[in-house]
Amino acid sequence: MTKQVFKTVFAGRELVVETGQVAKQANGSAVVRYGESTVLTAATMSKKMATGDFFPLQVNYEEKMYAAGKYPGGFNKREGRPSTDATLTARLIDRPIRPMFAEGFRNEVQVINTVLSYDEDASPQMAAMFGSSLALSISDIPFNGPIAGVQVGYVDGKFIINPSKEQKEVSLLELTVAGTKDAINMVESGAKELSEDIMLEALLKGHEAVKELIAFQEEIVAAVGKGKAEVELLHVDEELQAEIVAAYNSDLQKAVQVEEKLAREAATQAVKDQVTAVYEEKYADHEEFDRIMRDVAEILEQMEHAEVRRLITEDKVRPDGRKVDEIRPLDAEVDYLPRVHGSGLFTRGQTQALSVLTLAPMGETQIVDGLDPEYKKRFMHHYNFPQYSVGETGRYGAPGRREIGHGALGERALEQVLPSLEEFPYAIRLVAEVLESNGSSSQASICAGTLALMAGGVPIKAPVAGIAMGLISDGSNYTVLTDIQGLEDHFGDMDFKVAGTREGITALQMDIKIEGITAEILTEALAQAKKARFEILDLIEATIPAPRPELAPTAPKIDTIKIDVDKIKIVIGKGGETIDKIIAETGVKIDIDEEGNVSIYSSDQDAINRAKEIIAGLVREAKVDEVYHAKVVRIEKFGAFVNLFDKTDALVHISELAWTRTNNVEDVVQIGDEVDVKVIKIDAKGRVDASMKVLLPRPPKSDKPKHHHDKGHHPHKEYKGHKDHQESPKTEE
């Protein structure tokens, strides 16, 4: 295969695709150059069908630090585990690709995206999604694409496709939409309380752009695409299927309609165990025993799948007896835990999430170092899904892709209503512990997070609630479901999560198992979700009407002071010596930003006050006409040096000690004396002159002695300064 290059212009940037030059041993590969971002995508497929009961698709998105001209950190100085952003991007690509493989396809497929060069204004994520679809489409892997995806922004009332970094910073919308040329099949979004109408329009605008990219892919596939390989699909024995359906379908139908989750699972499992036992005995000596028993398990799964869908589409009956637009029973509680900074427990049917709030100084914020310039992340929402939440045993360890994705969705939903840093200078962490799950646990974590924030006194702009919508589709006949449970998610065609306030949507996420959904279905799903969201908000507001006016007693208190930027070095000191001393002495935590905002944190208000006093003293400046209670620290023949405060001294010239003539300074003051002085002058070098006599009653004019000073004498002429501060009595570290 020889190198071929295809070019177009998309969203104002050149899009270049190269094939036939690199990674030629993969089933399909492409280099996508978008702006100055370059992504290599390679797609490969195993030769044989995998043995599991699912399609083993793996999508990776690898960020190479050299792509942004950055040197890796850490001891090994090389890339380690994927960043959170890389993990989320891999999920973003996986989700629209997965539905495009045939039912029963079980060969392992890997799609590896490597970012080779990075342009922050030309999304490598969208280039990787384009490259993933293209590499699969031009390969011999039986992929029913192509698909494509775009980012959509909303600035000044206009939609922008693949916005630049600058445009993203002011956009009210951060939307990724993917799909085929006929329909949308994946959505991921955060929004600043936008209406359903605006969100729907954004989705449709995005899909129009997707169609352009698909047309470009089809042109490339026509030129360099391979013929598709013949692969074995998982098929069950039709005679065996007919036999099992005839004998056991009525039993399974009854089991599926048991309303309570655990009882329903027990009933369906009992039927499956009965059937399995019968056929294990019947075919115990058969040479294809393993294949037959695999078919039995698959047939039983298909029977349960078909019955759940039939009940909903034909009888309009859900497994737990609810109406199609009915929410499960709701419950909300705040202050579930003592000592923590805030907590909320939210229950929807058999799905339950506990959210716990922790507030910290801004110095505790997460530092994110990826391809973008290093930045600090103020708000984190972490989601944990232990196996006991579904009554099972299983793996424990670091969070997987699903947990990272669900945490990020909650983070997007809630960060839109957080107060600004100026209003609330804290780092904020929410942890959602899923205690029970029967579907829609990510949305329960959002509701619990709202409760925890409000209980903890975080002044959010409005409460946020989330709901998961489902879809059962049979050709033109479809049913949109409100608040889907686990069974409906597993056997349904769509998981459409919508979170927001009463004013509008703050987050969207959609995954589907069919090839796409129409604008009509999206409109209906958004309308039903709004109704459900308002019902949940009613409960949240009844539980806690507004954020509490004060933080929890255990939360760190904060006080802020503003200092001049040129004084920052005084407070920090050489090598951090001064600020470390303040922290050690008072037990507080101190953050100073580049604009001179000093934030002091502690659970002890007295410690905060002491630290403020020390810092104020460090940056304090003497002012003309101000009076100070000072201490005499040095005596010279021309006057006395007094300490006004901290490291600021002033000279009281001998002529300013008293109204009467003074021949000897020590006749008026001694070292260690405390005196009141008034600042009368500060010269260009910051040297301070003060007077004692101006604060004393002036004697009658006739008694006033005549002073004869040398012509042109300045009180600082003979000033040599303190031991370590020769230049000026005003000193800085």
Curated annotation (Swiss-Prot):
Signal peptide: none annotated. Its cofactor is Mg(2+). Residues 556-615 form the KH domain. Gene3D superfamilies: GHMP Kinase, N-terminal domain, K Homology domain, type 1, Nucleic acid-binding proteins. GO terms for molecular function: 3'-5'-RNA exonuclease activity; magnesium ion binding; polyribonucleotide nucleotidyltransferase activity; RNA binding. Pfam families: KH_1, PNPase, RNase_PH, RNase_PH_C, S1. It is an enzyme of class 2 (transferase). Its EC number is 2.7.7.8. It is found in: Cytoplasm. It comes from the Bacteria. Keywords: Cytoplasm, Magnesium, Metal-binding, Nucleotidyltransferase, RNA-binding, Transferase. Residues 724-733 have a biased composition (Basic and acidic residues). GO terms for biological process: mRNA catabolic process; RNA processing. The keyword Glycoprotein does not apply. Its main location: cytoplasm. Residues 625-693 form the S1 motif domain. Residues 691-733 are annotated as: Disordered. The keyword Metal-binding applies. Involved in mRNA degradation. Catalyzes the phosphorolysis of single-stranded polyribonucleotides processively in the 3'- to 5'-direction. Belongs to the polyribonucleotide nucleotidyltransferase family. This is Polyribonucleotide nucleotidyltransferase.
